[in-house]
């Protein structure tokens, strides 16, 4: 893969807490009281409509499920996941019982919810039935986002600003063992991160990593070996915070957010070819 090329920018506005694509449309989640989800055409990047998530109080991530044609939005304020039907606009929610952070959908079309503070990954059906949960190893501090691999293990990015380890790890399916890692002590060298914030994975199990405070996106092999930085700091004005990979169109959507005065104050989505 070559270094990504910027092909479009969506309008800047409120901070972006999630970006996902579904059925030829791109969905962007912003912190607002209404019309929180902006829907764009993936070809023209033209705004098509906006969707409201009723009863939402906060946001930490968004993902989508092609099988169920819906969006999932994690709400850390009321500790729940919102499910939004993109066809009819019907919205339901279910309790997570811990503060939810990153979201992903596995091959069984179930939702994986990463719970940072308790180091757990919880699996739910599309109707919110609790299926199982995995407690991560002690050294996987502050997990932010997790994706299940084809072998059943979990790719997890972890480590906040002040944590001694900031890495991407492959964890066994039962959560007991850390099998492989990339990263370590925080820093800006090739094999370091300053908050490995969010992940995306392609059909060959190659891993894209949003390196928030280094303003770059790393590409790792399926064994978590470093390949290259597909996006570098020169291509960002703010920190890359969320990722969405559209492998069929060879597009990587990156939400970048601006931090100032102790909080996120603005955000937008950049569109790259890869």
Task: Tell me what each language-model feature is.
Residues 41-45, 85-89, 124-129, 172-174, ...:
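Short loop/turn segments that connect beta-strands within beta-propeller blades
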Residues 34-38, 79-82, 119-122, 163-169, ...:
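Structural motif
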Residues 28-33, 65, 71-77, 113-118, ...:
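Conserved beta-strand positions in repeat-built beta-propeller and related beta-rich domains
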Residues 45-76, 90-91:
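Blade-loop segments of beta-propeller domains
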């Amino acid at each position: 893969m070559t270094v990504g090329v910027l092909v479009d920018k969506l309008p800047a506005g409120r901070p972006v807490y999630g970006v996902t694509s579904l059925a030829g449309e791109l969905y962007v989640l912003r912190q607002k009281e209404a019309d929180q989800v902006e829907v764009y055409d993936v070809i023209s990047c033209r705004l098509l409509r906006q969707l409201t998530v009723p009863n939402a109080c906060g946001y930490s991530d968004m993902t989508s499920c092609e099988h169920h044609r819906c969006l999932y939005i994690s709400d850390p304020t009321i500790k729940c996941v919102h499910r939004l039907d993109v066809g009819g606009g019907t919205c339901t929610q279910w309790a997570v019982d811990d503060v939810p952070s990153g979201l992903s959908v596995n091959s069984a079309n179930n939702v994986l919810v990463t719970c940072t503070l308790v180091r757990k990954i919880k699996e739910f059906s599309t109707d919110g039935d609790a299926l199982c949960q995995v407690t991560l190893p002690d050294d996987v501090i502050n997990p932010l986002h997790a994706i299940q691999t084809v072998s059943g293990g979990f790719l997890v990015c972890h480590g906040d600003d002040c944590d001694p380890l900031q890495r991407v790890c492959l964890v066994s399916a039962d959560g007991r063992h850390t099998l492989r890692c990339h990263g370590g002590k925080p820093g800006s060298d090739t094999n370091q991160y300053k908050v490995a914030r969010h992940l995306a994975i392609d059909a060959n199990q190659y891993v894209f990593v949003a390196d928030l405070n280094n303003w770059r996106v790393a590409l790792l092999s399926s064994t978590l070996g470093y390949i290259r930085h597909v996006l570098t700091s020169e291509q960002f004005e703010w920190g890359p915070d969320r990722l969405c990979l559209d492998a069929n169109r060879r597009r990587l959507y990156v939400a970048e957010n601006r931090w100032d005065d102790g909080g996120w104050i603005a955000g937008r989505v950049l569109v790259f070819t890869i």
